[in-house]
Amino acid sequence: MELENKLKKVTLGHEEGFGAPCLKCKEKCEGFELHFWRKVCRNCKCGQEEHSILSNNEDDRKVGKLFEDTKYTALIAKLKTDGIPTYKRNVMILTSPVAAKKDVSINTVTYEWAPPVQNQALARRYMELIPKDKQPVAGSEGAQYRKKQLAKQLPAHDQDPSKCHELSPNEVKQMEQFVKKYKNEVLGVGDVKLPKEVEAQACGAGRSTNGSLSTLTTVKGTEDKVAAQKESTYYCFRCKENMREGDPAVYAERAGYDKLWHPSCFVCFTCNELLVDMIYFWKNGKLYCGRHYCDSEKPRCAGCDELIFSNEYTQAEGLNWHLKHFCCFDCDCVLAGEIYVMVNDKPVCKLCYVKNHAVSCQGCHNAIDPEVQRVSYNGFHWHAAPECFICSCCSKCLIGQKFMPIQGMVFCSVDCKKKMSS
């Protein structure tokens, strides 16, 4: 009964972000409208993350659900109204005086997310060490980047069966087991600390850093200088460069005390993007974002973007597809056993290809069927037929012959070219 109730709650959140403008297509898109089962806009075919959707509440609920039943419950709160776990995102507001002609004004900068550390100076320095265009200052390019990465790296349909399209009871059960396993074994949240604090924490826990976290070097100077000086150096696990004295580092508990990262180096092994809000998945000595960890464990449907838990699925063009989702990207007709053409890595049926994507023949001005041979040169196309690929002057068939192309026209000889230009 409980499983049936979960299936009844299935929703793709079609109301969320409805009408939001597309940041990529601009005025060409009429506004966001979620496709029935694809995770794209029905109007422009761009993803939800490409639209200007104000979704802080929904994002916080998504991350809150991710942290539910994990060791990171301190980062969530449950609303009394519905009991849904919500991410207690750390927002940092910095104020600084700005000199004015008559008075001193206060400049306020709000970060939509910041490392949850007590030392604000450490959090501020962390922000300075990541690229400026990725700093999540409210209303900035960096804030938009964070929203986009939340959607990309932590898709709701990778953790919540109710966000998926028509899963069977068995698929729901498999997905729940999969999510429970990664929450227990690989999910983690980075911690921002000074390297010496991590070393002290390791010593307090009675664990060895194997010498890779820090090395102590004694330098002997002359009598008029300091007799002995101790210098502690720490290096980044990713780039192998030293940490600067006093700069914060990112520590990942699942990776162990002997590994630290520069803030800008705490990235996914696959996509190389900053791990959003320092949420990571640790596997085989590598950091992954949620999406790419799941991709390393399960096939993902190229149609609906969901993980595949069914034993039966199809493969085409090097991609995986649910059997019911191997469909035309334009009209959604099922393509099993049908002729299709790949357009921008998306399968399109023959009818839609001819209607929406086919190039026109310079000879007859009709669309060129995908199965018909063609001649292409410098962006111009012709049917490879004696009635189409002909001299623009004398109509001689040019198939298999030398020709002279001039602005979409072709000529069999210099004489014909001169006749047309005179």
UniProtKB/Swiss-Prot annotation:
Gene3D superfamilies linked to this entry: Cysteine Rich Protein
Biased composition (Basic and acidic residues): 155-165
Protein name (Swiss-Prot/TrEMBL): Testin
Domain LIM zinc-binding positions: 234-299, 300-359, 360-422
CDD domains xref list: LIM1_Testin (cd09413), LIM2_Testin (cd09416), LIM3_Testin (cd09419), PET_testin (cd09829)
Presence of the UniProt keyword Transmembrane helix in the record: no
Keyword GTP-binding (UniProt): no
Annotated Gene Ontology cellular component terms: cell cortex; cytoplasm; focal adhesion
Subcellular localization(s) per the UniProt record: Cytoplasm, Cell cortex; Cell junction, Focal adhesion
Disulfide pairings: none
Signal sequence region: none
Gene: tes
Domain PET: 92-199
Function text: Scaffold protein that may play a role in cell adhesion, cell spreading and in the reorganization of the actin cytoskeleton. May inhibit cell growth. Regulates cranial neural crest migration. Acts together with prickle1 to control axial elongation.
